[in-house]
Amino acid sequence: MSRRMWLAVLILGLSTYWARGDEKSPLTLVKSIPLPGVEGRFDHFAIDLSGQNIFLTAEEDHHVLAIDLKKGVMTKKIGGFVKAHAVFYRPASKEFLVTDDNGTYKIFDKNSLELRKTVQLTLNYADGLRYDPKTELLYIVNVPKGSENPEEQSYLAIVNTKTWEHIGDIPFKGGHIEEVAIEPSGSRLFIANGSRREIGVVDRNKRALVGAWPLTMPGIPYAVVMDDATHRLFVALRRPELLVVLNSDTGALVTTLPTAAGADDIFWDAARKRIYVSAGVGNQPEGYVSVYHQIDADHYETVAKIPTGSSSATSLLTPELNNYFVAVQRKQGKEAELQVYKINP
């Protein structure tokens, strides 16, 4: 389909999209936790469910924030980062891992918040990550810093979370990679490859790239998540701003829906058959959470577009607590905050 036809589809979708704002919201804001003194944009979350603590990477503030959800306060800013990106919490050892802008990952004790270990990866930039609970392996995006070159050598670094050792790399091409998604019932990972405008398919058992699905529409893939039950892959694109639904067996396009500008995080809510996309990166005047309902595997509808604040693209879905969290950047004198939403039926 031509670029002109895609733009026509996008405009038609927007006319429906904006008209649904008066319906009952799938999310209700229940409180906002102030994050005083925190500057710049955020990147990713992790949560300690048993202790109800959140770890939030404030990349431009060069800290990881420890937030006590029960007390509703930020308890500490953990320093020592160039730019903290993604974070993973391991309940078994009560430790968490943080990827950094210099190609390292750092391990911290949850209780003392002290640094225990630093590991240098193969390349000089470490970003998004995905955990495989079956093998207890963690996959970290490891790319050359600042590269947009589609032929650049990059890796998915493999980390054994029992020992925190870097045990291997999965090579692929493309310098600009944001996120990966895991196939829970199978052996695949899906790479949102922005440099090549495609979805890379990795076999975790073979530790190799086994396929690539070029996108058939304009846009750069940023965030990706999978619905294992219906074999559907949800991809958030920028420029133009689209939610793309793919068949995860073949890569075939199922449908597209419009989303807000600057999408950065995406989550699949299997219990409610919903997709949440948070958007508002950088200089976007306003941030939003776009919520979609899966009618069936091939049909979707936009149910809400919830304003969250300027530069508020970082989010986390926690079905165990029935909460959805959004980090909102400090702007025009208003302090940064963590918004806590209740998920409605």
Q: Over which residues does each language-model region extend?
A:
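Predominantly soluble domains enriched in secretory-pathway, periplasmic, or organellar proteins
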Residues: 17-345
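Bacterial N-terminal signal peptides
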Residues: 6-15
